[in-house]
């Protein structure tokens, strides 16, 4: 935003507008990362609390939405360390993502969620950001804090693992 309102009210309003534009996507990403709506809610709340407390820094970033997604990924990693195993209830529906090529090819989305949970955290984040959120390799690398080459290799390994896990389920 080029014009910034002064005072706390202005900061709150700017943050609200930002959150309105990114909240659904953050929530979907959080759910796809952890496989549980309640954990996703907590993850998004933690992410937004950190983003708000560092709002000026977030605004100065080249891509504020990428900065906040990076917070989300970091928070989810902390959660994975605490809870190594998450379960996905059968029949759980994933909201339709912006780019649904991969999800639409899977008969039961719960199976996709189960397969995602079988991936190591970094590979899961890469697949979610690249294919389910539709981000480029460059955007994904920026969010994950790694090179595009790392994104490519993590994606390749993840797709091989997903293919194996999904074949085992059929």
Regions found by a protein language model. Name each.
Residues 73, 77, 144-168:
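DNA-recognition helix of helix-turn-helix
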Residues 6-17, 27-46, 55-62, 148, ...:
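Short, charged helix-capping/linker segments at alpha-helix termini
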Residues 42-49, 62-74:
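Structural recognition of an alpha-helix C-terminal capping motif at a helix-to-coil junction
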């Amino acid at each position: 935003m080029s014009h910034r309102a002064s005072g706390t009210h202005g900061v709150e309003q700017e943050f609200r507008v930002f959150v309105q534009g990114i909240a659904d996507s953050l929530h979907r990403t959080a759910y796809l990362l952890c496989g549980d709506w309640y954990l996703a809610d907590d993850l998004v709340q933690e992410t937004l609390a950190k983003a708000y407390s560092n709002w000026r820094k977030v605004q100065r970033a080249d891509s504020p939405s990428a900065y906040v997604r990076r917070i989300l990924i970091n928070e989810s990693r902390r959660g994975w360390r605490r809870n190594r195993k998450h379960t996905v209830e059968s029949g759980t529906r994933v909201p339709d993502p912006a780019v649904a090529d991969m999800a639409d090819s899977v008969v039961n989305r719960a199976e996709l969620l189960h397969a995602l949970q079988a991936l190591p955290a970094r590979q899961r984040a890469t697949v979610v950001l690249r294919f389910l959120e539709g981000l480029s390799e460059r955007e994904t690398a920026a969010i994950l804090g790694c090179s595009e080459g790392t994104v490519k290799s993590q994606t390749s390994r993840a797709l091989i693992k997903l293919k194996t896990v999904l074949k085992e389920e059929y």
